[in-house]
From Swiss-Prot:
Transmembrane segments: none annotated. This is HTH-type transcriptional regulator BetI. The keyword Transit peptide does not apply. It comes from the Bacteria.
């Protein structure tokens, strides 16, 4: 977390610069010097407020996760509570459309995933993100099937989101949101049919 006193205008500037530099040279090449140059600030500001590159990566991921959460919430708020399939698709769109599908965000996500396996602070952020996604999905799925079934199907959808997202991230053409929606809805319809026959 950044120290108190960091001017609010600087945070978005530094977060954006971090993503831009990661997009351009990768995480290992994204030095404090390059990030500060991109942001138009001194390296000392990054070291003072964030304790270096690691702290800035953590703040950048917090920002990306906040934006993902806000986007999902906005999309859900536009839909009736009973429109469960539409609401599930809104959750998918929050993950595959707009800001989350920009090249600089995708590359920052990939860096975050690899680092979060070995870093407790980043691992906590990943767990928060995973719990939030599963919570959104289960809320909608429980209206369509039993709680136990909803738990299993939510895990399946989350795995598909991660897998499709990763494949899209590594594809030069990027993430195909329409194809992602088709694949996940096909899985969901098959699960609904299967569980309705139980």
């Amino acid at each position: 977390m950044p120290k108190v006193g960091m001017p609010k205008i600087r945070r978005p500037q530094l977060v954006s610069a971090t993503m831009t530099v990661i997009d351009r040279v990768g995480l290992h090449g994204a030095s404090v010097s390059l990030i500060s140059q991109e942001a138009g600030v001194s390296s000392g500001i990054i070291n003072h407020y964030f304790g270096g590159k690691h702290g800035l990566l953590e703040e950048t991921m917090r920002d990306i996760l906040r934006q993902l959460s806000c986007d999902a919430t906005k999309r859900l708020n536009l839909l009736p509570k009973q429109a469960h399939m539409q609401r599930i698709n809104a959750i998918l769109d929050a993950n595959f459309v707009g800001f989350q599908s920009e090249s600089k965000v995708i590359k920052t996500w990939l860096a975050f995933w690899s680092y979060s396996m070995h870093d407790e602070a980043l691992k906590r952020l990943q767990r928060v993100n995973e719990k939030r996604l599963l919570s959104h999905l289960k809320r909608e799925l429980k209206a369509l099937m039993s709680k136990e079934q909803a738990d299993i199907v939510a895990q399946g959808i989350a795995a598909l989101i991660d897998g499709i997202w990763l494949r899209g991230a590594l594809n030069p053409e990027g993430i195909n949101a329409n194809k992602a929606r088709i694949i996940i809805n096909d899985y969901l319809e098959k699960q609904l049919t299967f569980y309705s026959q139980q």
